[in-house]
Amino acid sequence: MLLRLPPVFLTVLIAIASCSVYILNIAIESGFADSPYNFNQTTVGLAYMSTGIGYILSSMAGGRWMDSIMAREARKVVRSDSHGKLISLPEDHMKENAWVANTLYPLSSLWFGWTMYYGVQFMVPISALFVFGFTLMLHFTLGTTMLTEFVRKRSSAGVTVNNFVRNILSCVGTIVAAPWMKGVGLRYMMTKLCIICLLLGSLGIWLITRNAQRWRGTLDKALKEMD
């Protein structure tokens, strides 16, 4: 039922990023294990740490950045309650942070794919993985937080739907990654993945920011009918 509501569907659409995570994970393993890197299993495992460090740092800094953006947007239009507490709206989550995250995580996968193809010194693709992890966590955080704001009365259901779709996309990514990479090569796979993620993510962000005010009324009415 919730997926029929536009803001929920589009927030889940932005979660296409989940698919890219698992495609990249398989690309890391096969890429570093092959020539010219020829990493052993332990070293390949250590390569995943750069993405993990990006996740950790982003989870620490991303929330503060998003909070500052939301407070700025509320102050800009003097939106507060009778006690002077700032009131934020769901679309306040998607400002420059959304565009930065949605742009950099696909581009970092492109960076990774092409530097791996040309056998550039291993710290260069490793750096791409760090940027990917950092910006992807920003992407996940703002998407989940905004979704709970849209469906406050059913926030747990909204997050469940989001996770359900993410898991499906993760499964798809895991299944298609190896044959896709074998068919077109790492660089072209990452190029196509970059384009898909950029287009779908940008479309979702643009539609939400453009229509959020109108959709809030429709969403509140629909949620009341579900009660």
Curated annotation (Swiss-Prot):
The chain crosses the membrane at residues 8-28, 43-63, 100-120, 122-142, 164-181, 188-208. The keyword Metal-binding does not apply. Glycans are attached at N40. It is found in: Membrane. It is a multi-pass membrane protein. GO terms for cellular component: plasma membrane. Induction: Expression is induced in response to 2-benzoxasolinone (BOA) exposure. MFS-type transporter; part of the Fusarium detoxification of benzoxazolinone cluster 1 (FDB1) involved in the degradation of benzoxazolinones produced by the host plant. Maize, wheat, and rye produce the 2 benzoxazinone phytoanticipins 2,4-dihy-droxy-7-methoxy-1,4-benzoxazin-3-one (DIMBOA) and 2,4-dihydroxy-1,4-benzoxazin-3-one (DIBOA) that, due to their inherent instability once released, spontaneously degrade to the more stable corresponding benzoxazolinones, 6-methoxy-2-benzoxazolinone (MBOA) and 2-benzoxazolinone (BOA), respectively. Belongs to the major facilitator superfamily. This is MFS-type transporter FVEG_08288. It comes from Gibberella moniliformis (strain M3125 / FGSC 7600). The lineage of its organism: Eukaryota, Fungi, Dikarya, Ascomycota, Pezizomycotina.
